[in-house]
Amino acid sequence: MAIRIRISGTLLLSFLFFSTLHAFYLPGVAPRDFQKGDPLYVKVNKLSSTKTQLPYDFYYLNYCKPPKILNTGENLGEVLRGDRIENSVYTFEMLEDQPCRVGCRVRVDAESAKNFREKIDYEYRANMILDNLPVAVLRQRKDGIQSTTYEHGYRVGFKGSYEGSKEKKYFIHNHLSFRVMYHRDQESESSRIVGFEVTPNSVLHEYKEWDENNPQLTTCNKDTKNLIQSNTVPQEVEEGKEIVFTYDVAFKESVIKWASRWDTYLLMNDDQIHWFSIINSLMIVLFLSGMVAMIMMRTLYKDISNYNQLETQDEAQEETGWKLVHGDVFRTPMNSGLLCVYVGTGVQIFGMTLVTMIFALLGFLSPSNRGGLTTAMVLLWVFMGIFAGYSSSRLHKMFKGNEWKRITLKTAFMFPGILFAIFFVLNTLIWGERSSGAIPFSTMFALVCLWFGISVPLVFIGSYLGHKKPAIEDPVKTNKIPRQVPEQPWYMKPGFSILIGGILPFGAVFIELFFILTSIWLNQFYYIFGFLFIVFLILIVTCAEITIVLCYFQLCSEDYNWCWRAYLTSGSSSLYLFLYSVFYFFTKLEISKLVSGVLYFGYMIIISYSFFVLTGSIGFYACLWFVRKIYSSVKID
């Protein structure tokens, strides 16, 4: 029986380890089988640009519109991401190639020309969806071996000049060559879509006479199967001129199975960098672990052993270091209520982050589940309110406070209130740009309802449960008169030690942070939650150990004001995170619009502030455990 349990445990650990390397992919929707001739409806999504970070509705530009535009019901995460999924004029028949289809003919007025030129200037990309697969442009890149990568969406157009002229003109991609890859089931003869690619072209279409019911183009004719040539005259964006939008579609059988169809989108060519990041972080952890072990095993246990013999050896006068402040180390810190609020909020963020990563590792938050990650984070934040209330109330009672209701109110409203205020200002700026990224009033109202209707009551429930629990007893008594803190050496003064303490936690995550920022601001998929989960565990250990080490040095300097110092020591890593985001902005992004820059730094302030609360709470709890551990092992009259 013992052998069976040991084998099962080994298998479980092996499963968890390998699952952390690359997260499982569980499809967001059930597979759909298509027969030959079945209609396929292409949906359009937002227009996006890495140069502005301001998404727009697809029909913001004067594209072909269906008779009635139908909006697909987006989930909360999709709305927050700025997705606007709608129907389109692009329709296919399964397994039937269509060499040339006319979408529509539009006349370009002054406003349309201005919008097209603006979107081309900022390199906007149009996004489409077929059977829950985003359209992509195939790219070949050489990195030792030939590899295929996808670029999400296609460019609205490009700038260029005619031969013999230096004047820059604007050209629009008005002809789309789609390629649909499918995998055929040999038994049922049905097919499943496993790929959706597009090659955009700019073509100045010509025709003799326009027939709305059956337009015949001399440059692209479905009857003669004319093909678009690479040397075709491009379609210029000119006010008062017309643009004919066309498309063709070809179907190609693929060996890729439906369950693996997202692999090309999620292809990662930089696993070695992630492994380097993890090894680098583990070296930091081993270094800190060695220091903590040395403190705990060689110094503390020896000191405690010697200190416990002071009664018989009559050496009480020789007390030095951390032992001298035993009567003050559990003294209630200044602004203890605010500390309780921040620690409780940190527990809430920690719970949300941990559960979100577990769901992501199991594949429930894959990119095919569009908006699922954002939705999960919002909902988990709401329901983790009960742990925030419980933690802040328990800590407040340990500090011998008697205003638990006020602490509960601050826990429920302070942190989310600050975030909501920043978010509201940013949303107002987005509204001013007429971007689809602006959160509609209905969604804003839903967020407020989640906050006031679920999160706040749960915070109060958790706080009530924590208040009813008996107070955590201090292992030693606190003196009535505070001990004077001696003058500290320069390297132990709060400002210096706090800033030093944040370097190592940031160093443990900064490489992974690069990929996260690239995913957020350069519209790339991030699906390496296995690596991220390992880095998150390393971050927890690093925050805990660096705070313990610096706390011990602080106590040895007879400075017993450790509570806020512990929180700020690990929390200061958020300062380095924000400074890195500034560096990333100026070196990796090409944002030129003022509003876009404000949005970037506004969101990075939110992320850095959340990181501060998370890491600060980890450091505080680690220090609390450490201090209680060492002082509970000492005999004190």
From Swiss-Prot:
Tissue-specific expression: Ubiquitous but weakly expressed in flowers and stems.
InterPro entries: EMP70, MFS_trans_sf
Pfam families assigned: EMP70
Signal peptide positions (record): 1-23
Record field: transmembrane: 275-295, 345-365, 371-391, 412-432, 445-465, 496-516, 528-548, 566-586, 594-614
Side of membrane Lumenal, spans: 24-274, 366-370, 433-444, 517-527, 587-593
Motif Golgi retention signal per record, residues: 635-637
Topology of this chain in the membrane: Multi-pass membrane protein
Main location: membrane
Cytoplasmic compartment residues: 296-344, 392-411, 466-495, 549-565, 615-637
Keywords, alphabetical: Endosome, Golgi apparatus, Membrane, Signal, Transmembrane, Transmembrane helix
SUPFAM superfamilies in alphabetical order: MFS general substrate transporter (SSF103473)
GO cellular component, one term: endosome membrane
Sequence motif Endoplasmic reticulum export signal, residues: 626-631
Domain of life: Eukaryota
Record's subcellular location: Endosome membrane; Golgi apparatus membrane
Family: Belongs to the nonaspanin (TM9SF) (TC 9.A.2) family.
Notes on the domains: The C-terminal KXD/E motif functions as a Golgi retention signal, certainly through the binding to the COP1 coatomer.
Name this polypeptide is given: Transmembrane 9 superfamily member 6
Source organism of the structure: Arabidopsis thaliana (Mouse-ear cress)
